[in-house]
Amino acid sequence: INRKTGLILASTVILAEPQLTKREKEILILIRQGFLSKEIAYKLNLSIYTVNNHRKNILAKLNVDNAIEAINKAENFGILY
């Protein structure tokens, strides 16, 4: 934005790649493999509340509404292979 005129100088917005923690990536991979939260909790020796908190954070960081959208977006960004 030009300070004097208030006009936008560039119309292109560059989106930064979302940053997931190692644990969030691990959980997203397990979700992609079809594991439920309670199964992920057991497998990783976490409480289900911790797993669900990670799931919530993943959705927020990727700005999506559900796990399928999160998986697709993470694959598109190269976060998951």
Please annotate each region the language model reported:
Residues K73-Y81:
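Intrinsically disordered, low-complexity basic tails/linkers immediately adjacent to helix-turn-helix/homeobox/MYB/SANT
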Residues K25-R32, L59, I71:
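Hydrophobic residues on short alpha-helical segments
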Residues G6-L30:
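Regulatory hinge/linker segments at domain boundaries
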Residues L36-E69:
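Recognition helix of helix-turn-helix DNA-binding domains
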Residues I1, Q33, V64, N76-F77:
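Charged, alpha-helical scaffolding/interaction elements associated with membrane systems
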Residues I1-T5, L9, K43:
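C-terminal output helix
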